[in-house]
């Protein structure tokens, strides 16, 4: 792992206040009351050190596989590769997890360490979460598979929040996210 790449510990939004307000308003479409309560709990529970019966969000790792080899990522280390399964989660297990949390957990993030969009049933997973009443379905991605047709499938499936990792601009991005090209992102 390369040790000279500085780690960005910030999270920045580059948008107008009006667009941010509209985004938040639309983000809760169809479950406004529940969403407001869910987001209030995100703030209040940690402050009061309250532990609810169920978590507010469950991360479901569809796979620890990734199609990149970013120099700062621990998933490229031999230790990680030797200790963590690099297979796709089976559909039956995914269904079982979602069935167990449906109606109890308001949000699911379909990623953890790997690139979730590589899973062959990725769009089906989003659909299943929404069908079971999960209010907010999100995922993290390196963006490598977000071609227009696939992106449309993801949106139509009901994904609520997509976080795309962009670590730098132009050459710096290409150095980190190789073999991706910044102009294509």
Tell what function each PLM region has.
Residues 2-161, 172-184:
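Conserved alpha-helical substructure of the radical SAM core
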Residues 169:
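Conserved Motif II region of HX4D acyltransferases
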């Amino acid at each position: 792992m390369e040790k000279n790449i500085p780690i960005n510990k910030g999270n920045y939004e580059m948008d107008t206040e009006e667009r941010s307000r509209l985004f938040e308003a639309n983000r809760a479409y169809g479950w406004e009351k529940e969403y407001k309560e869910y987001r209030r709990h995100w703030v209040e529970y940690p402050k009061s050190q309250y532990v609810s019966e169920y978590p507010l969000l469950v991360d479901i790792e569809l796979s620890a596989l990734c199609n990149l080899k970013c120099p700062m990522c621990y998933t490229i280390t031999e230790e990680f590769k030797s200790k963590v399964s690099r297979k796709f989660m089976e559909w039956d297990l995914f269904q079982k997890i979602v069935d167990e949390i449906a109606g109890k957990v308001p949000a699911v993030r379909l990623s953890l360490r790997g690139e979730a969009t590589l899973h062959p049933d990725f769009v089906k997973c989003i659909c299943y979460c929404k069908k079971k009443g999960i209010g907010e379905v999100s995922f993290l991605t390196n963006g490598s598979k977000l071609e227009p047709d696939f992106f449309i499938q993801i949106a139509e499936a009901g994904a609520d929040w997509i976080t795309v990792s962009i670590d730098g601009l132009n050459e710096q991005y290409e150095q980190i996210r190789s073999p991706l090209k910044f102009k294509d992102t």
